[in-house]
Amino acid sequence: LNYMLADWANRGVNNWTVTQVSQTVATGITEIPAGTITITVADSSSFSVAETITGGTSAATASVLSKPTSTTMNLTVPNGTFTASETITGGTSGATTTVTTAPSLVDTQNTIDIVSAIIRRDGNDISLERIGRSEYLQIPDKDASGRPTQFFLDRQITPVIKLWQAPENSTDTIIYDRLVRMDDADAAQNDMGVPFRFFPALAAGLAYYTSIKRAPERMQILKALYEEELMRAMAMDRDRPSMFINLGYRY
C-alpha cells in the first residue's frame, strides 16, 4: 500500500497533501529548510537571529532563522545532530542555554516539492520565480543582498530552499505551498489519510499491486482498471481557475 501511495506522489500534485508554510527570513541566510526545524531550549531571548549556534557536546551547528517564543528557535538544516541536555552557544551573541528538545528533521523531510512561493514585505506579496539547479549554479554572486526574487529547491533527503538574492533583512516572510508525503499505512484500525473520492482508485490499486504476486494472470486488466480510476480521481482533484477569453477584431 505504501508503494502505491509513493506512486501517487510521483505522479504530481495531490491537493489534499498541499500545506502552506510561513517562515521569516534572516539577513544573509540564503539556505532555509523546506519545512520547519525547531529546537526547544531553556531560554532563547539572548540569542540573535542569523547567528550560528554550536552544540557543546555534539559540535553540531545551525543558523537561527527566527525565535517564535522565548524557548524555541527555528533553525537552518543542522550540520550534525544536536542532543537534548547539551549546552549551545551563540557565535555572535555569546549567549548560552540548554537544549530541552533536540530539533527534528521529519517535517522538512516530508516535503516532496514546492508548488509556489512568494515573499511578503509590509503586507505586499511578490512572487518568487523558481529556477533549476543549473540556473542557480550559474548565478555569479550568490551572496548579493536584496529582496529575494528567485529560489531553487535542492531536493536532498532533507530538502533545502536556496534563495537569491540573499535576504537584506530579518523581517520579510517567505510563504510557500508545499506538497508533502502522505501518511504511511500502519495499524489497520487507523483511517487512511485519503479523500473519499480516491477510494475507488485505492481499492483498484491495492488489487493491482496484490495481483503482481498473487494473481499475475490478472495483472494487466487490474492495472488498466487502476489507471482509469486514478486518472479520473486526479482529474477531479485538479485546480479549476476561471478562464476568460477576449475576442479581438481586425479590419
Residues of each region from the PLM?
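Glycine-enriched, solvent-exposed interface loops adjoining structured elements
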Residues: 1-35, 98-251
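Autoprocessing Asn-cyclization modules and mimics
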Residues: 12-103
